[in-house]
Amino acid sequence: MEVSKQALQNIISDEERLLFAENIPAEYLSDALGRRTGTADALVFARSTEEVSGVLRYANENGIPITPRGAGTNLVGSTISLFGGIILDVSRMNRVLELDRDTMTITVEPGMLLKDLQAYVEERGLFYPPDPGEKASSIGGNISTNAGGMRAVKYGVTRDYVRGLEVVLADGTVLKVGGKQVKDASGLSLKHLLIGSEGTLAVITKCLLRLLPKPETTVSVLVPFADLGTGIRSVLTILQANANPTAVEFMERKVVALGESFSGVQYPRPDAGSYILLTFDGHESEVNANIERVRRLALDNGAIDYIVLRSAEQAADIWKVRGALVMAVEAVSEQEPVDIVVPISHTADFVRYINELEASSGVRMIAFGHAGDGNVHLCVVRDGRDQQTWERELHDNMEQAYAKAYSYGGVASGEHGIGISKRPYFLRETAQENLAVMNTIKTALDPKHTLNDQKSYIVGGK
């Protein structure tokens, strides 16, 4: 059914927040990569739960597809409107609704950006630990993909900081799940069902988040090793020693060289084959004790140096290279970003396999990521291939990479989500029984499949 302008105008009184067909900007028809494009009949900028509910109810009654959207930083096509219909944008729902110091919680709208939330709470002596790399992502999007980031090794992922949600189901029903209480053994955890569902089950309209006291101090350490295998083995020893690092990143020298070239910052010890970059936070005495403990462990386990980054400027430069790696690759060539996860005991094995796959296939594959949790970020680089060759070789290499990750007991994504681009590999590697349960839940909550259909786990549908 065609989208009725009048019907949407009856729900959204402000016409500036309604765009139709040819007036919809191109960036709203894609994800952050901009390499896949959808179509849409209408773009709606909602400002309230009531408006979200009204739009969903109208769409459900008329069989109109809905694509939820936040800041649009998604990398796997979750925000691409595959079947036309309505793009429901909640980016203007971006307010802090309540800060409750007694329960150490904050309630925000889904369009609030991660960087704004972090700044808001840190100015007040508080701390929101989840820290995915894209700081301009929205909190609703972080919840929808269960985003993680570098601090997951110590603090966990977004799921661990969501106390409650207000969501709107496909038929317009407003649902409130969770709350300010710490414990809950009352029935099924609907909150956890919704987290990570990539907009396929409901649209988030309010987020109740758990906060911590802001750490007293934060110090980073750069540890060079002769090779990645030695570095990763050292990480396992560090984690088992209760040194409690906040972040543990790994980078091979060939990857660091790209980041250096792009950022203009040079790493010390260019003779190293790999680097482990750690951060410690907490009380100053605790941080210093952990730094010293890890110094002994690292040097005893093959580190060729141990560089404590005491100045904020020095630490910022070192982290600038780490943060620039994806942009450094993009500056050279189109690339497909992947965030496969393996058990931490297999991180070095998996990266070694990726290097072998690169050599055998001739397709450049650049791996780095979170050594503390086994989340490997992989850039598969196009390097001038024509479209047909690129699509074929990308698919072949991805099939092999995902198969190897699953053979180690890994999964398809640690924080980006599945969306469109990872869906074929996820569907192939996931047990049919698991997919059947997921799709039964989808059909129960969205029987008409109006919400983000044919994304992630969904089979059948339209």
Question: Model features per residue range: what roles?
Answer:
Residues M1-K462:
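Noncatalytic alpha-helical scaffold of FAD-dependent oxidoreductases
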